Amino acid sequence: MQSNRTTLMWASFLTLVAAGVGFATRAASGPAWASEFNIPSSTFGMIMGAGFLGFGVFIFLGGLLVEFFGYKKLLLLAVILHLLSAVMLFVAPTLHAEWEESVGIELATKNTVSLLYWSVFLFSVCAGLYEAVINPLVGKIYPENQTHYLNILHAGWPGGLIVGGILAACFQNDTAWIVKIPWHLALTTYAIVLVVLLLIVIKESFPDTVSQRGNVKVITLFSCFASVPFLVLIVMHALIGYMELGVDSWQTRLMENLVDNSVVVLIYTSFLMFTLRFFAGPIAHKLNPIGLLFVSSLLAVGGLLWLSTEIGSVLVIFAAATLYAFGKAFLWPTMLAVAGERYPQSGAVAMSALGASGMLCVGFIGAEMIGVQQSDATANYLRENHVALYEEFRAPEKKSFPSWGGRFNLSLFEIQELAADKQQATMNNSDDPNSATIKAAFDFGSRTALKKTALIPCAMAVGFLLLLIYFRAIGGYKVIELEASEQGSG
């Protein structure tokens, strides 16, 4: 047993807290970016999507690197790069002002979008390296109950969302509870957690990885990909990433007009997730991990469909958010536990492959798709009900999806969206005679996006049901010990 495993658990926990703080404050920055830089919902979604692209690539590459370079070196690299991403955010307003003077507002906005995009991308690279280290590390130092301790570890993510959400509610946007501060100050607060984390990692010793401990062949690390159930798990985790992280990216923005300060909904659901993840072990022992995933998917469907209805009561909004939180709480960490318990011979590779699929899906498709669905439905509402306002507010150019498709001459479809700065300014000005109509259109778009997203956990439920049937057919879900795993697993 690793003598300092509690300290290592805390260090691992703090990586997710830092990521959660950055994510929550960034998710609440949409109104500020729309007003200050004229960034529309679709572009905001693209930037938020960058917060998953680097994660998806580097959690998988990190899974390979950690096997051969060890936990400590990779974790130190991630913390340093994470601090650099905070610096990029901090200087964005200053650089935008300088660019506006030198090259004009249009190029200044374009350059600022690029700076924000690459800062968020670097943030996601670090998050990917964190996950590549901490998931197999916690699985290794707590082999007796991986589902329980991986869920506790991943309580750090909603814990960070709570801290970041409170910061956003108190200090971001016009609805700030205490005082509105510049958005870049709020967004860089995660650097405080990183300094504490850096001090812990420097002085602690870490255990060896699977590859460092013995003469393990590379082909053994990749043997999980020869298992059909594992390939199904990859698809399921991609859908989990789309649903959980895609909706989290948009939750604050989508509920902007439903409650006085929409960040409180994110804080509330994050608090529920934080609490629930400490009780995953006993629940998983009763249902088994696959059963827990199946039930969670069904609850997520109900929660999203409820949130997508026209709700007039704040209490009902929180009730629907409660159901959704119960649905999503156990999905991500329990999937990682299944990878660790069923494919121990693959070390960090199996867990990293699942994490990569989730992040790549939300990065390339999910976050932007939800934004596109919201923008499209908002514009359609005006076009069908208020033609004159639609003509007044519509953006001069159509938006292609996916935004990165233009680089490869690939565009699945185009939408007509509204001009972001004009839309946001009208919604913020209650004296504007068009404010109520634009808010109604925005709310309709938000509900439509949530309703369409509910199809994702529907597909997840079908997949987990098939896995339940499979494991029952082979005698039930069993944890595979590393010594016995050389013969392969299913």
Each predicted region: which residue ranges?
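Central cavity-lining transmembrane alpha-helices of secondary-active solute carriers
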Residues: 49-64, 267-280
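Extracytoplasmic
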Residues: 7-39, 135, 247-252, 366-367
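Low-complexity, proline/glycine-enriched hydrophobic segments characteristic of transmembrane helices
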Residues: 98-103, 368-454, 486-490
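Helix-loop-helix hairpin linking two adjacent transmembrane segments in secondary transporters
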Residues: 144-145, 152-209
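Hydrophobic core of transmembrane alpha-helices in multi-pass small-molecule transporters
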Residues: 100-130, 316-330
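C-terminal ends and interior cores of transmembrane alpha-helices
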Residues: 80-109, 299-312
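Extracytoplasmic gate region of multi-pass secondary transporters
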Residues: 26-30, 223-273, 363-373
